[in-house]
Amino acid sequence: ADARPMKIALTIAGSDSGGGAGIQADLKTFQQFGVFGTTVIVALTAQNTVGVRAVEAVPESMVNAQLTALAEDLPPAALKTGMLAEAALVRTVARAIRQNGWGPLVVDPVMVSTSGSRLLTTEAEEVVREDLLPLAALVTPNLDEAAILTGRVVHDAATMERAGASLLRFGAGAALVKGGHLADGEITDVLVTPDGVRRFTRPRIETTPQSISASTWPVSPMIKVLSETIRPLTRPSTRRTSRKRN
């Protein structure tokens, strides 16, 4: 048997009662890639395949307690953020990432629901841009989120490239602008890095958000490029070794 310890990946996001997004989807993905998933839950959502019925933010003190517990005993080798609910929670999360030297960080800036509703206040959107993006090795907005973060109209591959370049100027190491909302028969994702631009195009597949295997099978070339992109962008860790407990 392989005696090597599993690497730890942390997801900081909201809980989705429907299991198709948020913490639940992240943990399924982590398991697919053979890493041990840990969580910091920042919001509770009551939702299903039809829509979101309610959202409630977790108190800042509880979010901070979760972050502290993981820093003491289960520090991540990599982490991602999803919906962070409120400006204060974004600041709390960004502060913990800086203080613990955690990385590489993937920021999925969940700001707009599938029905088009804004999920964050304007203040929270600004804090994501100012506090979280400079910590990110990779930011992965969809078209709506890229438009919010950059203040640009994003509607095709060319504007996706320009938005990605703007996100790098805000401090992100790389930007993957996801074009799943484009109204045509193909999906085009645009990866912008300091070395240039790559486009990934694949046929649109009608599937549910819960169909993880269906949604991930076409992206293996992208995963290879992303891993090669993120590796040199990883910031040196300033994590201190935690004391052993008796």
Regions found by a protein language model. Give the residues of each.
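Intrinsically disordered, low-complexity polyampholyte segments enriched for Lys and acidic residues
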Residues: 2, 26, 130, 161, ...
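Conserved N-terminal subdomain of the carbohydrate kinase-like
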Residues: 3-11, 23, 27-119
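Short pre-catalytic strand/loop immediately N-terminal to key active-site residues, enriched for Gly-Thr
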Residues: 12-18, 198-211
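Short, small-residue alpha-helix embedded
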Residues: 24, 29, 147-148, 206-219
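Glycine-rich beta-alpha junction loops
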Residues: 44-45, 85, 111-113, 145, ...
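Nucleotide and nucleotide-moiety/phosphate-recognizing core
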Residues: 87-102, 162, 173, 191, ...
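Conserved phosphate/ATP/ADP-binding segment of small-molecule kinases
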Residues: 122-196
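Low-acidity, Ser/Thr- and Arg-rich intrinsically disordered low-complexity segments
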Residues: 211-220, 227, 231, 235-245
